[in-house]
Amino acid sequence: MAPFGVYRSKAMNIAFLGLGGMGGGMARNLLKHGHSVIAWNRSPEPAAALHADGARIAATPAEAASGAEIAMTMLANDEAVESVTLGANGLAEGLAKGAAHVSMSTISVALSEHLATAHEARGQRFAAAPVFGRPDQAQAGKLFIAVAGAADVVERIRPALDAIGQRSFVIGETPAQANLVKLTGNFLITCVIESLAEAFALTAKGGIETSKVHELLTETLFAAPVYKTYGEIILANRFSPAGFKMALGQKDNRLVQLAAEKLEVPLPFAAIVRDRFLAALAHGDGELDWSAIAKRAAEDAGVTKPG
């Protein structure tokens, strides 16, 4: 199998379901790479905007999936993905035998396993390809993708993934493995946010300018995008508009703990972050970026702002 990124692109008929902050940019990049896109979204405004860019718009998920080689979903949570896939007029009703559903949402391991079984019973194929990145990266086609599924399905969907991301990583042949990797990655991001918030609170309380702390950290031992990006957001108190909403972060924290419980793996840090999310939601911060959990660490330290 050729590496991702060097595969000669093949124009495909693609259904894309879910045109939110991430999905809209992803669908546009499919169009830019010459793919034919038929889209569906619950609310009409994002669909109308994508139609102006050249996509066809379907009235139902089943209609979108009808005639598609692959149907890609980018939706908020388990409930939305299950409803759009297996509910009345769901994509599974329209997807042809042999065609593939590619779930790109951050969903539970359990739902991914259920979708794989449901599609197999219908003679359809299934792969999971959740993404790492924020909305600006989705618009620029610079996402990172964790993909898992049967080798022939992964091979078939590569042109679409190459249009959406800068690099894809094949995790395995069981789709749910990609979902576990995605949940693990999001768990690590929340640990970074919490540790930065605590470090900024400590140094601020000690009378140190936190921007200097951030500069030192990110130009030496912590020169990674996640520290730079979230450190800058926290320092600037730039929690709105949200790149990833607090409520979604809390959802992912819950899902990683469910996965860990099933595998009998303790995640003590996940429990700490869970309480940060619950406190943030209790304070009315559900619409803010998930990095606003940093506000709670600042409050605990008696500091006026996280950075």
Tell me what each language-model feature is.
Residues V37, I57, F126-A127, S168, ...:
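Hydrophobic beta-strand scaffold residues
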Residues M26-A27, P46, L115, A160, ...:
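Hydrophobic residues within alpha-helices
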Residues P175-A301:
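Helical "substrate-binding/catalytic lid" subdomain
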